[in-house]
Curated annotation (Swiss-Prot):
A Pfam family: RhoGAP
Subcellular location: Presynapse
Residue ranges of domain PDZ in the record: 179-264
Positions of the Rho-GAP domain: 948-1148
Protein name stated in the entry: Rho GTPase-activating protein 100F
GO biological process, one term: synaptic vesicle localization
Species this chain originates from: Drosophila melanogaster (Fruit fly)
Domain C2: 789-908
Chain intervals with Pro residues compositional bias: 271-286, 1282-1292
Knockout-associated phenotype: Reduced synpatic bouton numbers in neuromuscular junctions (NMJs). Defects in the organization of the remaining active zones in NMJs. Reduced Nrx-1 and Nlg-1 levels at presynapse. Deficit in early GluRIIA incorporation in postsynpase assembly.
Biased composition (Polar residues): 750-760, 1356-1377, 1393-1408, 1416-1429, 1538-1587
Recorded GO MF terms: GTPase activator activity
Residues modified as Phosphoserine: S719
Gene: RhoGAP100F
Length: 1866
């Protein structure tokens, strides 16, 4: 009777009188385990002595009322068996076989239950009529408890009838007596709370204090609060202790209660709903709460001293629980290895096993006290130790029960304790150690309902603690360790602890447990442990994410849990490593199994060890085990195990999911606790809201608190919840509570809220114990799940959209063969299975691999985005490392039919060929999903990141990183990580990662978005990262596409003309330019990234349509914008995003190509990225993720200013890649180029660049960096210098170029400017040479080019041998390139040309030749152009020129190149593009070109936009007309010209060479170009180069490049005319249109007029863009028209024309200029207004690019473009096309696209100056360029007047004007 004494002592200590004590009656049998849940209320648990016995006793009862008869003796075995069996109640099961013996002995000792009483109970249970027999069968089958009023005559035997009549005679005037029969499953909780006394006039007697809402008892109306229980199965209980009563009630499956009720309350004997509604129930719960934790504590303490009893308690409890609950509940079992281990641990702890095994704990859940209870408890909460436990208990019914009688430990009442304790204490004890050991089991353990609810954590913790407490003596630290390790390990967090601290043991966690145990002051006796645990948890683990786990685990978990939490925290890395998909480690798994088996055995022992000695033994066993095989429990092992198992996070998630799942249904399930649950939930919610206070008042609170701590941890509250959830999952009640909380709190995401909606909704019976306990880690009560099988194909109903939260709990009965025999045969063998979830045959998610034979616990949750989906398929595959995975089972659910009925479902899905998969689903409709109401942060009370305003987040983050792009760090980090890991992952953005892990990651981001570890070691599943990114976008208070702007885009899409792709793209991009700064930058950043993803669609299977389907709604949908009553239209955002992705540049393809070329040349690229611009892009692309491989996009760039250049390089590469992508569309290219300059413009804000401009910028940066090295490394630099017209000319030479532009020259201005910041001069120098060299070096194909070059060069030879050589080389390069990449041959040539133009580039291409060219200023300039072109081409090719990106690239890139290394960049791109374009032209697919150009434009726009909100882009949009009017015919061209002109003016000759190269080139180049051009785009450029050579081969070269760009922008096939115009820019086209005018014309099918004009200036025209300043001019104009059409080319040319000789250098630019203008327009969408002009203008952006390109080369040229662009963008242009560095000024301006958009640009600039980090840079460039631009502009104006006309609208007069304005603005 020690226990009994102890119990009394506890009672005394707690000061809880019997009256105050309330017991949760009847274990929850719903679970199929004997859950003394009801009994197991915290109060109950306290009676230590009893509980232990109680537990077993209860276990027996629960386990099997019938098993019980097997005899207490059997209980010993039974317990073990039950554990094993996992079927019957945890305790009872355990007690099952040996029930009688064990239970009796134990009960006798612990409680006053004698063998006679047991026999009586059994007799009544077995002596029943047919009705009852049918009811028993029904219950077994369905799991639903049956409650009915029984007539005495139905009692069976005569004896029984007589006894019943005697009881009936106790009725009097005020009371009626009736018999109520309750038929339940063995471990099922009744959902009753009982107390001593009625709280009024009686202090003795057993009264029902409350009934769980929605429970079977509640719904039956047969029992009501305040009824007195006279007898249970005819055993008089009026004088028994509550614990004994609880135990008695939990033993049998058939309970016959003799109830005395007040008359009138319910009507005389009328059972019924009235009771249900009676308010009476609630007060009792409160009372229940009152019970002191101390009792439990004492009990626990007692237990400590008497391990046996605690073990007993645990055992009965734990054992059963272990099987079912542990398996099911915690999900430990889920992880088979882990769970095995855990199980073992669990079992090892005698008590623990019992507790865990206690499926009834689920039942117990129902008991969790209602909020009132919780409320009360909270009051107690203050006393930490006691109150903590109290809290935990208080929170739930369970806790209430605990209080009533130390259910857990069974401290107060012997009998109740068994079950109760089993739930609470047992769970607590064993749970602690064992729970920890196997957290999942702990969940089962935790099945204590109360624990499950909120108490769950408490309970779990409690259990664990209890166990640990119990064990501490017995198991000592080791067991604790194991427990912790097991449980936590499972979670990952616990893992560490386990290793570090023995859970129970004295070790910190253990110590706490022990301490707690020693201090009976805890409110719950059983819970004590939990209490202590939780308290420790709080203290100890408060901080750790585990906190939530602890909370999940409950007090017990607390100690262990807390410790484990700490461990988890410590092992956060492990946790972080959780991989939802990764398979559990085999070794671990085996180990896990071994341990689990051991645990189970131990557990069984536990069952056995109802007796204290057993308990001790068990503890000993556990300890021994641990000690003996420390490895099993080592932290590392656990960690590994964890890893293998879903991760801690997965487990947590699993638990949480289960908990959620159960929680929803559990409302009913825990009938007793149902009402409590609601209260608890409410309480929890409040707690949740104030997550900060870890120790919630109630159990729930406590859980919440723990959760909160977790949130403090890296994981977010939800995650923590999940972690806590592990335990909670085990305990349905708690789980349910938690789930509800989750639902209500919705941690964070709308998806999170999904749960909240139906948290309490589906009352499901407790988890069933039907599945064999041994295999079940998750306790599943089939009765809670609706059987579902999709027989008929889905009728054609509308699909379902929104978010579907789906929790895949487990698979049961997954037999390998149809026949049972086969199944049994394979039962022994384990298989590795994983689940795949598909929606309408599209793969959406997959779970981790689980091992088992028939039972598999995946316990993972996912949040699936639904867009009109109708069917959900669950496919189970066998995992095989060697062979193809085999589909083993499949089941389908009709979403459209099932979700229309209700958003919440718990389904037992029948799968073929046989088996069942248990699933919980919660649907959130689109209106709720896209309400975009931010969830307040727990700390701040308002959303700090997720759900916070974009501008606010960006402004806050920019304080720490001034100058960084206005893109939220969370997006940047996620995108960088995705690109770093590769964009070839199948299903990127479509697949969902584990919802739990996602929440953990969200928590981490909320805490510190910069410090989050996203490495594969921490976040193995990339889909978790993409899920966080989507959640962030979905939760923005306002969509990234603002509502009005989204409507505009939808309208624009509706009016798009099929035959005007370019205009369509311009229009769309112009709209995007209206976005607010942060939105625009972020959108451009994302579109750059998404275009990369789409560019890898062959490998990642994510086409533009697929990606738009996933990303469109989060980016654009807003519930407020939907018509009231109407469904949200998902088709519009999908169509808009798809269109944007189609017109956006796709850097990746190019990247890849580049990568190929750059692969070997990575060093070369860096060292000799003379073709930096092009190469850069390529380089970026090479990595295959926007240069991510280099890390351009990574935060590294922003992070390391020192490495800024490198970063920039990388970025440039990325940009380049984007350019390649762009190449498909001219405008896109332009965008890219613009973007580059923009980025460069913000050179100062390296961070910003890296961020926003990452893609584009990186591209440019890469170019720049690459170029630099290249220059440094070789003559490439020399070429660049030329580009810087006058200043460099002196250097002409590579050295100068390299030096001055060295950094950024080639790729983008000066390195430091990084393209954008570079001073105009720098830019100039950089202008052509650098870039070209970069590309060359990257290409590494220069030699072949060289070979070809000679041939091509022949034409250019005219200029200068050197130049011609250069030209030749260029030409060669082009040809070679072509050979290399047929697609891009032309482009390549052009690019080569450009490269050649750049002497240094040339050199790179062909060292000697380059040098040669370098020597001659002119020559070097041309070479520059050539090099640029060549390099561009090669780069491009490498980049995958052939892609449309090439075209776009050409334009854009040309622009970029121009900007970066003017000629090089733009030319390079140009070259490639030109090729493409040429082919397009040939094919006469103007439309295609146009479309491409359109795409390009969009990309460009975006790019630009992104990079810096480019002035150009906006301007055109804003005042396309303005520019147009000003420039109307001329202005624009002039603008373009401007760029060129200055060059010409500026260094006519030298300038020509450099920037003015074009000019020089103009004359001679022209013819040369023509030839070249004709030959090859690049060659033409080469020619130009040659011509330029004469005067400035460069110019020519450049021009061709430019031309090429335009042309290249196959985007603008239609821009072909541009090509024509390019002709004029022969130089630019030059490359493309080798022949100046003619070629240009030819090249551009663009415009004949251009052609004509071009032709006439052909050489020059082409040159115009290029070097042909004068000729160029005329040509330009002509071209302008064509160009305008072409956009890139035309403008470029036209502008090029502006060529102003400048054209020479700008020629490429020029081309670009023209293009730029066109592009600009295009970009802006304004251009369309102007029609042809518009086209040109659009391209103009590109042209501008070119122009600025030119500019770089020649200030003037650059300026012209620049001015035009500049004005618009102001710096934007410039920096954008810094890239063009060559034409620094121009660069800036060109970017502005300003030629025609000049005004707008200016405006834009002014507008966005503040916004644009790069503005200053712009200014700088513009300033320089400004002047030049002016000069050029004028020149351009002259020449380009007609061109202006063409581009008029674009550059329009503006160009000139714009230039001036721009300057002024500057």
């Amino acid at each position: 009777m020690q226990w009994k004494k102890k119990f009394t002592r506890l009672k005394a200590a707690t000061g809880n009188s019997r009256v105050r004590r309330m017991l949760c009656c009847g274990r929850r049998k719903e679970n199929g385990r004997s859950v003394p849940d009801v009994t197991a209320s915290p109060g109950r648990a306290p009676p230590g002595p009893l509980p232990a016995n109680q537990m077993p006793a209860m276990g027996n009862q629960q386990h099997h009322g019938n098993q019980q008869h097997h005899g207490n003796q059997q209980q010993h075995h039974g317990n073990q068996h039950s554990n094993h069996r996992g079927q019957s109640g945890s305790l009872s099961n355990a007690a099952g076989v040996k029930d009688p013996v064990m239970l009796q002995g134990d009960f006798r000792k612990v409680s006053g239950i004698s063998s006679e009483i047991f026999r009586q109970i059994e007799a009544v249970e077995n002596d029943h009529d047919p009705n009852t027999a049918a009811a028993l069968e029904a219950v077994e089958r369905r799991g639903e408890m049956i409650v009915r009023v029984l007539e005495p005559r139905c009692m069976g035997s005569k004896q029984a009838v007589d006894a019943a009549h005697k009881l009936m005679n106790k009725a009097d005037a005020r009371h009626t007596v009736q018999l109520v029969e309750i038929v339940k499953r063995p471990g099922q909780t009744l959902g009753l709370y009982i107390r001593e006394g009625n709280g009024a006039d009686r202090t003795d007697g057993v009264f029902i204090s409350r009934i769980a809402l929605e429970s079977a008892v509640y719904n039956s109306g047969c029992l009501r609060v305040g009824d007195e229980i006279l007898a249970v199965n005819l055993v008089d209980v009026t004088h028994m202790s509550l614990d004994d009563v609880v135990i008695i009630m939990s033993i049998p499956r058939r309970l016959v209660l003799a109830i005395r009720q007040r008359r009138g309350n319910r009507g005389t004997g009328s059972p019924g709903p009235p009771t249900l509604s009676r308010p009476e129930q609630k007060p009792p719960p409160v009372v229940v709460i009152k019970r002191d934790l101390r009792d439990e504590d004492l009990d626990e303490t007692d237990r400590m001293p008497r391990p046996r009893s605690s073990r007993d308690r645990r055992t009965g409890d734990g054992r059963e629980m272990t099987e079912s609950r542990s398996r099911l509940g915690l999900g430990l079992n889920n992880y088979s290895p882990q769970s095995e281990q855990l199980d073992m641990y669990y079992n090892t702890r005698g008590g623990g096993g019992g507790a865990m095994g206690e499926p009834p704990n689920w039942g117990y859940k129902p008991p969790p006290p209602p909020s009132s209870v919780i409320t009360e408890q909270p009051t107690k909460a203050h006393a930490f130790a006691p109150s903590h436990a109290y809290y935990q208990n208080a929170g739930t019914l369970e806790s209430l029960a605990e209080k009533v009688h130390a259910f857990y430990p069974g401290q107060p009442g012997g009998p109740p304790v068994g079950p109760s304790r089993r739930m609470s204490t047992g769970t607590g004890n064993v749970g602690l150690a064992q729970q920890h050991a196997r957290f999942p089991r702990s969940g089962s353990d935790q099945h204590l309902p109360r624990v499950e609810y909120s108490d769950y954590s408490n309970s779990l913790g409690r259990h664990s603690l209890l166990r640990s407490s119990l064990k501490p003596g017995t198991t000592g630290g080791a067991p604790m360790q194991v427990g912790v390790g097991g449980t936590l390990g499972r979670y990952g967090r616990y893992d560490q602890q386990r290793a570090g601290v023995s859970k129970y043991g004295p070790p910190s966690g253990g110590a706490q447990s022990l301490t707690r145990r020693s201090r009976p002051n805890l409110d719950y006796s059983s819970d004590t442990e939990a209490t202590i645990g939780p308290r420790p948890s709080y203290y100890y683990y408060n901080r750790p994410a585990i906190g939530s786990m602890s909370r999940g685990s409950g007090g017990a978990g607390g100690g262990v849990g807390a410790a484990s939490t700490a461990a988890l925290l410590a092992g956060a890395a492990d946790l972080n490593k959780f991989n939802s998909l990764p398979r559990e480690r085999p070794g671990t798994r085996l180990q896990g199994i071994r341990s689990r088996m051991g645990d189970r055995l131990v557990d069984e022992n536990d069952g056995n060890t109802s007796a204290p000695e057993f308990d001790v033994r068990r503890g000993r066993d556990l300890r021994q085990r641990i000690t003996a095989s420390p490895s099993i429990f080592t932290a590392d092992e656990y960690r590994a195990w964890l890893r293998r198992a879903p991760s801690s996070s997965a487990i947590a998630e699993q638990m949480r999911m289960t908990r959620d799942m159960f929680a929803q249904p559990r409302a009913q399930r825990f009938s007793c606790s149902a009402e409590n649950i609601h209260d608890a939930l409410r309480n929890t919610e409040s707690i949740y809201s104030s997550r900060n206070h870890i120790l919630g008042t109630g159990t729930l609170d406590r859980n919440m608190g723990l959760t909160r701590p977790i949130s403090a941890l890296p994981v977010r509250s939800m995650s923590s919840q999940h972690i806590g959830g592990a335990g909670s999952i085990r305990s349905p009640s708690i789980r349910r509570m938690r789930q509800l909380l989750e639902l209500s709190a919705g941690p964070a995401s709308p998806s999170g809220s999904i749960l909240s909606t139906g948290g309490h909704q589906s009352p499901a019976p407790t988890p069933s114990a039907t599945l064999p306990r041994p295999h079940r880690q998750i306790d599943i009560n089939p009765a809670e799940f609706a059987k579902y099988k999709l027989d008929k194909p889905i009728v054609d109903i509308g699909g379902i959209s929104g978010m579907l939260w789906i929790h895949l709990l487990a698979g049961r009965g997954l037999r390998t063969a149809p026949e049972g025999a086969a199944g049994t045969a394979t039962q022994g063998q384990t298989r590795d299975l994983y689940c795949v979830i598909e929606c309408d045959r599209v793969h959406k998610a997959r779970t981790v691999v689980r091992s088992g034979d028939l039972q598999f616990d995946w316990d993972e949750s996912f949040e699936l985005d639904l867009v009109g989906n109708k069917q959900l398929d669950v496919l189970v595959y066998s995992w095989d490392p060697q062979h193809r995975h085999k589909l083993c089972y499949r089941g389908a659910i009709s979403l459209s039919s099932i979700l229309r009925q209700s958003p919440l479902h718990q389904l037992a899905l029948k799968v073929e060929p046989r088996g069942t998969i248990y699933i919980r689903m919660r649907h959130t409709d689109p209106l709720a999903l896209y309400k975009r109401r931010g969830l307040p942060s727990l700390r701040a009370g308002y959303p700090t990141l997720f759900g916070a305003d974009l501008e606010t987040v960006v402004n806050r983050e920019s304080k720490n990183a001034p100058g960084s792009a206005p893109v939220p760090i969370v997006l940047r980090r996620c995108v960088e990580e995705v690109e770093r890991r590769g964009l070839d992952i199948i299903g990127l953005y479509r697949l969902c990662g584990s919802a739990t892990k996602k929440r953990l990651l969200r928590e981490a981001f909320e805490r510190n978005s910069r410090a989050v570890e996203l490495t594969p070691e921490h976040v193995p599943d990339i889909n978790v990262i993409t899920g966080v990114l989507k959640d962030y976008l979905r939760e923005l208070p306002e969509p990234l596409f603002t509502r009005c702007l989204f409507q505009m885009t939808v309208d624009a899409l509706a009016v798009c003309l099929p035959d005007d792709p370019e205009g369509n793209a311009k229009l769309m991009l112009s709209i995007l330019d209206c976005l607010p700064r942060a939105n625009r930058a972020t959108l451009v950043f994302l579109l750059d990234h998404l275009s990369l993803v789409v560019s890898n669609s062959e490998r990642n299977k994510m086409s533009a349509q697929a990606l738009a389907t996933v990303m469109g709604p989060p980016l654009m949908l807003h519930s407020a914008s939907a018509q009231p009553g109407a469904d949200i239209d998902h088709a519009q955002p999908i169509a808009v995003l798809k269109y944007l992705l189609q017109i956006w540049p796709q850097p990746q393809a190019q990247h890849q190509q580049m990568a190929q070329h750059m692969g070997g040349a990575a060093g070369a690229m860096m060292g000799g990225l003379v073709t930096a611009g092009s190469m850069s892009n390529m380089a970026g692309v090479a990595s295959g993720r926007r240069g991510e491989s280099t890390g351009q996009r990574g935060s590294k760039v922003s992070a390391l200013p020192a490495d800024r250049q490198q970063l920039l390089l990388q970025q440039q590469a990325q940009l380049m890649a984007a350019g390649n992508l762009l190449r498909s569309s001219t405008s896109v290219t332009n965008i890219l180029s613009q973007g580059h300059p923009q980025l460069s413009a913000t050179a100062n804000n390296h961070l910003y660049q890296s961020v926003v401009g990452q893609l584009a910028q990186s591209h440019r940066a890469l170019q720049q960096a690459v170029q630099q090295p290249y220059q440094l490394g070789g003559s490439v630099g020399s070429a660049i210098p030329d580009p810087s017209p006058l200043p460099l000319p002196g250097t002409p030479s590579p050295g100068s170029s390299s030096a001055s532009t060295g950094s950024g020259s080639g790729s983008g201005k000066s390195t430091d400017t990084i393209k954008r910041g570079a001073s105009p001069v720098s830019v100039k120098q950089v202008k052509i040479v650098d870039q070209p060299s970069s590309p060359y070096s990257i290409v590494m194909k220069k030699p072949p080019l060289q070979k070809d070059a000679p041939v091509e060069i022949t034409t250019p030879t005219t200029q200068a041998d050197t130049e011609s050589t250069l030209g030749c080389k260029e030409s060669n390069g082009t040809a070679s390139r072509r050979g290399n990449v047929d697609f891009y041959d032309t482009h390549k040539t052009q690019a080569k040309s450009v490269v050649n133009e750049e002497s240094s580039y040339s050199s790179k291409y062909t060292g000697s030749e380059t040098k040669k060219i370098i020597p001659g200023n002119s020559s070097y300039t041309p070479s520059k152009a050539n090099a640029s072109g060549l390099s561009g081409g090669e780069d491009y090719k490498a980049m995958r020129n052939k892609s449309s990106a090439t075209s776009s690239s050409s334009s854009s890139q040309a622009t970029v190149l121009s900007a970066g290394s003017t000629a090089t960049s733009a030319p390079t791109t140009s070259s490639d593009d030109s090729d493409d374009l040429v082919s397009y032209k040939s094919s006469a697919s103007t439309n295609a070109l146009l479309a491409q150009s359109q795409a390009m434009t969009t990309s460009q726009l975006m790019s630009k936009y992104l990079k810096r909100e480019p002035r150009v882009q906006f301007t055109p949009i804003k005042s396309p007309e303005s520019p147009s009017p000003p420039g109307s015919g001329d202005g624009l061209p002039k603008g373009t010209y401007q760029l060129v002109t200055p060059i010409s003016g500026s260094s006519s000759k030298p300038g020509a060479t450099t920037g003015a190269i074009s000019k020089y080139t103009t004359g001679s180049v022209e013819s040369s170009i023509n030839a070249n051009s004709q030959k090859l785009s690049s060659p033409s450029r080469l020619c130009n180069s040659k011509d330029s050579n004469s005067r400035t081969g460069t110019a020519s070269s450049t021009t061709p490049a430019t031309s090429m760009v335009s042309t290249g922008r196959r985007l603008f096939d239609s821009l072909a005319s541009s090509s024509s115009s390019e002709t004029e820019t022969k130089t630019y086209i030059g490359g493309t249109t080798a022949a100046s005018g003619a070629i240009t014309t030819t090249i551009y099918t663009n415009d004949t007029k251009n052609s004509g004009s071009s032709s006439s200036k052909s050489g020059i025209g082409g040159g115009s863009g290029t070097g042909l300043g004068a000729v160029s001019g005329a040509s330009s104009e002509t071209r302008s028209f064509g160009s305008t059409l072409f956009g890139s080319s035309g403008l470029g040319n036209g502008n090029g024309s502006s060529h102003n000789h400048s054209s020479a250098s700008p020629s490429p630019f020029t081309t670009t200029n023209g293009n730029g203008n066109h592009n600009t327009m295009h970009l802006y969408g304004t251009l369309p207004k102007n029609g042809t002009s518009t086209g040109a203008a659009l391209f103009g952006g590109s042209a501008n690019s070119s122009s600025y390109h030119s500019s770089a080369s020649g200030s003037g040229a650059g300026t012209a473009s620049s001015s035009g662009v500049s004005s618009m963008t102001g710096s934007t242009n410039s920096y954008d096309f810094y890239t063009s560095t060559s034409s620094t000024v121009s660069s800036s301006r060109p970017f502005a696209n300003g030629g025609n958009n000049y005004h707008t640009l200016g405006t834009y600039r002014a507008q966005y100056a503040a916004t644009n980090p790069f503005l200053d840079a712009f200014d700088e460039k513009p300033g320089s360029n400004g002047g030049n631009a002016h000069g050029e502009e004028k020149l351009g104006a002259d020449k380009g007047h007609h061109r202006a006309a063409v581009m008029a609208f674009q550059s329009s007069g503006d160009s000139k004007n714009g230039s001036d304005e721009y300057d002024d603005i500057k």
